[in-house]
């Protein structure tokens, strides 16, 4: 028997609602804010139970990748059908394509808060 259920993934950021909106739009999910929340927490939720959470951090500093001055501690990989089309779409949402591209079957981007994430063909 499992001790726990699927964990939520929580990303630190300066603006939880803005980053939840970015990921919810990219994944075609819904943004959920708690009624008693003061804006320091937001969630992007799918219809089938998956969730990304976003927590406000005062004086947030984005990770520096691929360097290690402020290393990333995790990153998200999302599967897409077409790297060019998906890349253009996430840039339109506010992402930035990273200058360092170490592979051919994925592309590295930075979300609006500076977290690295990858668009992957599989």
Pin down the residues of each PLM region.
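Conserved short beta-strand elements that form part of the metal-binding/catalytic scaffold
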Residues: 30-70, 116-122
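Short, acidic, Ser/Thr-enriched surface-loop or helix-capping motifs
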Residues: 111
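Mid-chain, well-packed structural core segment of small domains
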Residues: 65-90
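Short, low-complexity, polar/charged sequence segments that are solvent-exposed and flexible
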Residues: 71-75, 96-98, 117-118
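Core segments of cupin and vicinal oxygen chelate
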Residues: 3, 10-52, 85-88, 92-108
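N-terminal beta-strand motif that seeds the catalytic metal site of vicinal oxygen chelate
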Residues: 1-20, 73-80, 120-122
């Amino acid at each position: 028997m499992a001790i726990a259920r699927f964990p939520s993934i929580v990303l630190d950021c300066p603006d939880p609602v803005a980053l939840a909106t970015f990921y919810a739009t990219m994944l075609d999910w819904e943004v959920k804010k708690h009624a008693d929340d003061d804006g320091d927490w937001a969630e992007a939720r799918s219809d089938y139970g998956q969730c990304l959470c976003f927590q406000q951090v005062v004086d947030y500093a984005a990770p520096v990748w691929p360097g290690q001055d402020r290393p990333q501690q995790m990153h998200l990989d999302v599967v897409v059908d077409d790297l060019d089309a998906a890349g253009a779409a996430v840039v339109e949402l506010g992402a930035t394509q990273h200058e360092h591209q170490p592979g051919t079957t994925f592309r590295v981007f930075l979300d609006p808060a500076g977290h690295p994430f990858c668009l992957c063909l599989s």
